[in-house]
Amino acid sequence: MIIDNHVHVGWFTDGYHSPREVWYSEMAAGIDGMAVSSTSTCAELYKVVVREMRELIRIGGNRIYPILWLTPKMMKRRYALPFMLRSKVRWRGIKMHWGAHPEWAHNAKLVEWGLGVAKQLKVPVLLHTGNNDNCHAGKFAGIIQNNNDLTFVLAHGRPIEEAIELINKCSNVFVDTAFMPMSDLNYLLDEGLIDKVLFGTDVPINRVYYKDLDTVSYIKNQVDNVRSLGGCNASLIFNHCVYQSSNISN
């Protein structure tokens, strides 16, 4: 079994990626299930997001793990968050992206509110990590240490040294391999942290960076890379999904 823990549908800079397009690309590449958030959220298109998730669930059933991408505007608008929570989508995680929405970095009360949503739903929190200072994995140390009742996933695991330091300090931290250099994955494995690694691809964002490679081939390449590094233990990465354990229906 292979679970892709980092997938998107919706509007992005290169156009629209429909639930059907993404689902069939993943299935054609041999993926068995996927945790997915909608990039349409960044345009605050809440009804579109709900339709996308419902369509994914209609196609993929219990192999879909919907991730609710929170934005500062969503949190502040009186109707938006209640609409998402009452949408009858069974959210399996929440996502917060300091890079796409820098307000998170300087609004601690808003962050606390967002984490409260995760606690209400009893689901993990996916945090984007990246090369911008406000997205460095180490920046989230306080949030993670002060919320040890939540599970956190550091998307991309950047910078890898900071991600590893957090994993070693906090038992509630994982990383996904979306756009992760294989040298970083090798670093994690050398540190004996294979049980903290989730397979992820960031499909369909690959279409922006790898224009000459179709999505199915891109996914297969990622699977092959992980398999070559993980060897006989690669299944520990492929099978791992922290979003499966949510038991709250909205």
Predicted regions and their residues:
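Active-site gating/metal-coordination segments in enzymes
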Residues: 48-124, 171-173
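A general structural detector for well-ordered alpha-helical segments in enzyme core domains, enriched
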Residues: 21-26, 49-56, 80-87, 110-114, ...
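Divalent metal-dependent hydrolysis catalytic cores, especially in the metallo-beta-lactamase
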Residues: 5-8, 14, 21-44, 63-71, ...
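Hydrophobic faces of well-ordered beta-strands that scaffold small-molecule active sites
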Residues: 3-7, 34-36, 66-68, 92-96, ...
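Acidic-and-aromatic substrate-binding clefts and catalytic sites of carbohydrate-active enzymes
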Residues: 11-18, 40-48, 70-78, 101-107, ...
